[in-house]
A protein has these predicted regions:
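An acidic-aromatic loop/edge-strand motif
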Residues: 70-81, 185, 190-194, 198, ...
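Hydrophobic core segments of beta-strands in well-ordered, beta-rich domains
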Residues: 12, 62-63, 101-121, 143-147, ...
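Beta-propeller domains
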Residues: 20-22, 26-29, 93, 109-110, ...
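Beta-rich accessory regions
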Residues: 1-34, 49-68, 76-78, 290, ...
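Conserved Ser/Thr-centered positions that define the repeating blades of beta-propeller domains
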Residues: 26, 135, 197-198, 247-250
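Hydrophobic alpha-helical membrane-insertion signals
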Residues: 18, 23, 53-55, 65, ...
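Structural motif
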Residues: 21-22, 125-129, 189-194, 243-247, ...
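Surface loop/turn signatures of beta-propeller and other carbohydrate-active proteins
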Residues: 2, 31-51, 69-103, 122-125, ...
Length: 501
């Protein structure tokens, strides 16, 4: 059908359990944009919206289901309260649609940018675009326009950002520092591409010289770019296949040469690469994968990455996945976000981001441990905190009046158990268990346990060296926290706080 784009958004009513149908937009006989949606004009579960801003005021051809009736609007309609019932209270979610990996993380001009894998047309994976949001503090987010649209070359898979302050790529226009976004174009071939912004991240333009890297093996993806200041070079971490990863080098961010390939046991896809200075003053490089297996290493005289110890593990569940650090700049905290894979049942949106974490490196008993703690900004969310520091307890209970809460323990005494929103957590001599997840304890005498709960997931941090995210839909009838120990437990720190934005 011919379609005059009279307003920005085209309504797409969808049935969650429906069959996907193909929509293809063409101009002058050439397909330019396509997506799949479970189109259901009768009794849809939710409405989604095709953003056709690039075609406003023009006539295009739309190949759509035979019974499709085009309806335009100026803006998406707000969701009904019932549709938002399970929206996490303090964790990032898309307004609509599925999200997964965090992408293009950077801090620029006082704002944290979060780009993310996004399906604008349903609550399940597909149609990979890059969504976009900005925040002054990593908790209060403002949704921005869809940043990268899938095209006829492929979907927009994961990638990273660079704040190109020295204009190494030569893409600066005007006074703004260019922001560079590396991503995988996933179509018939999987190639590494570049988009850039010269207006502070508001608009992304696909680079005319794409791809930067051709397909080397099928499915190679997820470029993460960082500057190696000591050797004055740019590095790109890339996933190849199986458990095989690599590193490329460049001087101009446009032309890349393979430096090396190696295996990361127990992991696949979504590499991250960044330096950290340990608590003993030694600066080392972290190379990690989507499952949070990680190497601690350094570069040798030939410039090759060499792990200095056996592979480590930070995350002990598959619910916290595909973590990425914000673009590294010396002297600033190393902050990362991970995708929380916990389902949000029945909502027009699905998936969230884990609590933003600050990354550190600690030498414990001669081994380096990658550590993650919630960023300090979580303190600004605390409401109605109960403190029982320095007390000895066997039993404790209190109601919880908010959707989100934080519980923090510090103790040398174990074991004990607790229940939060109906979820059982056991603190034992060897570590912390919750559901199928077990977080092992290091050699440290004191156990520091931090628990962050929201509507559909609970995160647990043990001494920073082991973390997990456990899917758990809150039961409103169990909106409480309780603790029980067979023998008295002395708590150097014991705090229960409700959280809210």
């Amino acid at each position: 059908m011919e379609l005059y784009v009279e307003k920005r958004y085209l309504k797409i009513p969808v049935k969650f359990a429906g069959e996907n149908r193909r929509f293809t937009l063409s101009e002058n006989g050439v397909p330019v944009y396509a997506f799949d949606a479970a189109y259901a004009p009768d009794a849809p579960d939710a409405e989604y919206y095709a953003d056709l801003r690039d075609y406003a005021g023009r006539t295009v051809a739309l190949d759509a289901p035979e019974n499709f009736v085009p309806v335009f609007c100026d803006a998406p309609a707000p969701l009904a309260p019932a549709q938002n019932a399970l929206r996490p209270a303090v964790h990032f979610t898309a307004e609509r649609g599925w999200i997964n990996d965090p992408n293009g993380l950077c801090f620029y001009d006082g704002r944290y940018h979060l780009f993310y894998q996004h399906n604008p047309y349903g609550r399940l994976w597909g149609n990979m675009h890059w969504g976009h949001a900005v925040s002054p503090d990593l908790f209060h987010w403002t949704h921005r326009e869809e940043a990268l649209f899938s095209d006829m070359e492929g979907a927009m898979f994961s990638g990273s950002a660079v704040v190109d302050r020295e204009n190494c790529a030569g893409l600066k226009r005007g006074s703004e520092t260019p922001l560079l976004f590396f991503y995988t174009s996933a179509g018939k071939r999987s190639t590494q591409c570049l988009a850039y912004s010269t207006d502070g991240g508001e608009t992304l333009v696909k680079y005319g010289g794409n791809p930067l890297l051709p397909e080397l093996v099928g499915g190679n993806r997820d470029p993460k770019v960082v500057f190696d200041a000591e050797r004055s070079r740019w590095l790109m971490a890339l996933y190849f296949e199986g458990r095989n990863y690599g590193i490329f080098v460049s001087q101009d961010l446009l032309h890349w040469t393979l430096l090396q390939r190696f295996d990361l046991p127990g992991d696949d896809e979504c590499p991250d690469l960044y330096p950290l200075t340990a608590d003993d003053g030694r600066t080392l490089w972290i190379y990690s994968g989507a499952h949070d297996m990680y190497y601690v290493g350094e570069f040798d005289k030939k410039g090759l990455y060499q792990p200095i110890q056996a592979v480590g593990q930070l995350s002990y569940s598959s619910a916290a996945y595909a973590a990425q650090t914000y673009f590294y700049e010396p002297g600033k905290p190393v902050i990362r976000l991970a995708w929380n894979r916990s389902e949000i049942p029945g909502a027009p949106f699905n998936g969230s981001m884990c609590t933003p974490m600050e990354m550190t490196l600690r030498n414990i008993g001669g081994r380096y441990y990658l550590c993650a703690h919630p960023v300090e900004g979580v303190e600004s969310l605390v409401r109605n905190e109960t403190r029982r520091d320095g007390e000895t307890l066997c039993d404790y209970a209190q109601p919880l009046r908010s959707k989100a809460c934080r519980i923090a323990f510090e103790t040398k005494s174990v074991p004990f158990s607790c229940k939060v929103y109906g979820l059982d957590i056991c603190v034992e001599t060897g570590g912390v268990s919750c559901g199928e997840a077990f977080l092992p304890r290091t050699e440290e005498e004191t156990m520091q346990v931090e628990i962050l709960c929201d509507t559909t997931s609970t995160e647990i941090y043990l001494n920073g060296t082991a973390i997990t995210a456990v899917p758990h839909v809150q039961d409103p009838e169990q909106a409480s926290f309780s603790l029980h120990a067979e023998t008295p437990v002395h708590f150097e720190k014991f705090r229960v706080a409700e959280l809210a934005l």
